[in-house]
Amino acid sequence: MSLYGMMRTGVSGMNAQANRLSTVADNIANASTVGYKRAETQFSSLVLPSTAGQYNSGSVLTDVRYGISDQGGIRSTSSTTDLAIDGNGYFVVQGPGGSTYLTRAGSFVPDKNGDLVNSAGYYLLGAGADEAAGGLTVAGLNVVNVNAAALPAEGSTAGDFTVNLPSTDQAPAAGGYNHKTSLISYNDKGEKITLDVYFTKTGADEWNVSVKNAADGVEIGTTVLNFDPTTGDLVSGGNVAVNLGAYGGQTLNLNLGGSTQRAGDYTISQAVINGQAPSSIKGVDVGNDGAVVAVYENGTQKVLYRIPLANVASPNRMTVVSGNIFLPSAESGDVRLGFPQGDGMGKIMSGTLEESNADIAQELTDMIEAQRSYTANSKVFQTGSELMDVLVNLKR
């Protein structure tokens, strides 16, 4: 072993420990960075060929491994567009140049156009609300936009109203009725029209149905229900054409099919009429299955997108890019897409963020180890230098 070889080995060791200290510094600096994945310096020896009686000292090589597949802790936030993944998978995001990447940094907020973008400037990509998992491709994804249009007014055109009329009821006095229920419908401007539905028994198995506008008492629809005397099932008259034309609406077909005349109380098993008033968007929720849902002021919910997750065979072999994003490579394998809670993917948690997976206690321990190792390698170099001085002084 030559003295120069000894000194070169010491320098190699110092460089290796300096690299380790650099990764430790990065980890400590990013201990609070959302979605950050810890870097770790790995060492391997470089052995030089030796001859009999002569040892040639080698050196040490370093490589940096990122714990991309290691999940960090999950903490709660107050924003529904802050997203974390519990389990496998990565969000698919788009950079300013249009390139796509993967990330676990889910601190998304709407920009001025309503597009969801994270703190590093990468836009979240999603699939259509009705997209099937088998048809997912990265090229087919679009930037998720939460500026959903307001719900337009929609006039009522159809409804289902199912009741049980007590078979023991008697026909009321002239001008009276047995039962009354109020229903809400809408004209074409989205204005509410309250409908009063009157049931009046007119025979053993016959009932008159009258639909009136509650505001003025005008009858705008009528029918006669006939029931089977043995089973109590509806035989005829199960549809009422309610004319809302005088109130700015359309003809509402109110279906009474399924109604019965049997023993018991007057009960309603179904009362649904379509139509709606105009409504503005109130907020956006994201489900565990990745559904991005617009919530409107009137309580209506509408699925805007479904957020898919991506994965690769070897996540730790992906290329790390600034902004806590990852670029799949030949070593990591091809990108595979799937929806959360299926296809081997984890679930999306709204109102949470994944923290850095760097542990301060571990990093400080590694820093002390690297510092001591650096000092030891410097002693090797120093000893080699001193021996070289001895060799030079032999000439004197």
Swiss-Prot record:
Main location: other
Pfam families linked: Flg_bb_rod (PF00460), Flg_bbr_C (PF06429), FlgE_D2 (PF07559), LlgE_F_G_D1 (PF22692)
Superkingdom of this protein's organism: Bacteria
GO CC, one annotated term: bacterial-type flagellum hook
Subcellular compartments: Bacterial flagellum basal body
Matching InterPro entries: Falgellar_hook_FlgE_sf, Flag_bb_rod_N, Flagellar_basal_body_rod_CS, Flagellar_FlgE/F/G, Flg_bb/hook_C_dom, FlgE/F/G-like, FlgE_D2, LlgE_F_G-like_D1
Coiled-coil regions listed: none
Keyword RNA-binding recorded: no
Keywords tagged on the record: Bacterial flagellum
GO terms under biological process: bacterial-type flagellum-dependent swarming motility
Protein family according to the UniProt entry: Belongs to the flagella basal body rod proteins family.
PANTHER family attached to this UniProt entry: FLAGELLAR HOOK PROTEIN FLGE, FLAGELLAR PROTEIN
NCBIfam families reported in the protein's UniProt record: FlgEFG_subfam
Descriptive protein name: Flagellar hook protein FlgE
Record organism: Brucella suis biovar 1 (strain 1330)
Lineage: Bacteria, Pseudomonadati, Pseudomonadota, Alphaproteobacteria, Hyphomicrobiales
Originating gene: flgE
